Design a protein with these regions (language model features):
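Catalytic-core regions of hydrolytic enzymes
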Residues: 36-56, 67-70
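Catalytic-core segments of hydrolase enzymes
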Residues: 56-157
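Terminal peptide-recognition signature
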Residues: 4, 18, 59, 83, ...
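Extracytoplasmic/secreted envelope proteins and their assembly/folding machinery
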Residues: 2-9, 44-48, 77-80, 121-124, ...
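Subtilisin-like serine protease catalytic core
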Residues: 1-41, 118-120, 130-131, 139-143
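Extracytoplasmic/periplasmic, Sec-exported soluble proteins
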Residues: 36-43, 71-75, 116, 162, ...
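Sec-exported extracytoplasmic/periplasmic mature domains
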Residues: 9-13, 23, 49-57, 64, ...
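Hydrolase catalytic cores
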Residues: 8, 28, 32-33, 57, ...
Length: 183
């Protein structure tokens, strides 16, 4: 989370560390990951609702996965619908599995709602410094929205340090930062 927050909103031009994309953006940190394993879907749904009820314009979720039990998907789908109603953009990075998401379903996704596709939902994969998709990223002609820079991104790190990060999380943070400039 620290590196993503730095990509999005680190103070610009202060001579320290890195420059965030939208340094006027406010970060609302909500922990939904238990530390090991996958995030609890109930906690994800509650965090989405909390964020939109407290003014979040952009929500950056953890990576998609295929482990959403059917009975629990509705919790997240309903929370995403609430975010859509309140005008919040939801950004989710893909997993690094080299899987065609048009053939294998990953969650959350824009088609989770039975009453139609979500219009506020963006799925992001990582590209390299030349703009090419990274080799192990998931892909999909209809399920992936865009590729964004996600390799060797210099950002804040724990303990008042800085380092380079690579992955879908860096790409999705880049998109969230640009979205914050537009909002």
């Amino acid at each position: 989370g620290v590196m993503k927050a730095g990509v999005i909103a680190a103070k610009r031009d202060n001579g320290v560390g890195s420059n965030g994309i939208a340094d006027n953006a406010e970060i609302m940190t909500l922990r939904i990951h238990p530390g090991e394993g996958e995030p609890y879907l109930k906690d994800m749904a509650l965090a989405i609702r909390y964020a939109v009820n407290h003014g979040a314009d952009i929500i950056l979720l953890p990576e998609q996965n295929s482990l959403y039990p059917e009975e629990q998907r509705q919790w997240v789908a309903d929370a995403l619908k609430e975010a859509e109603k309140k005008g919040a953009l939801v950004i989710v990075p893909v997993w690094d599995l080299s899987v065609d998401m048009d053939k294998d379903e990953f969650f959350p996704n824009r088609k989770m709602r039975k009453d139609g596709e979500l219009t506020n939902f963006m799925v992001v994969a990582s590209s390299d410094k030349n703009g090419n998709p990274v080799l192990n990223t998931n892909y999909g002609a209809t399920t992936l929205d865009l590729y964004a820079p996600g390799t060797d991104i210099y950002s804040s790190y724990m303990g008042d340090t800085y380092q380079k990060g690579t992955g879908e999380g860096m790409a999705s943070a880049t998109v969230a930062g640009v979205a914050a400039l537009v909002k």
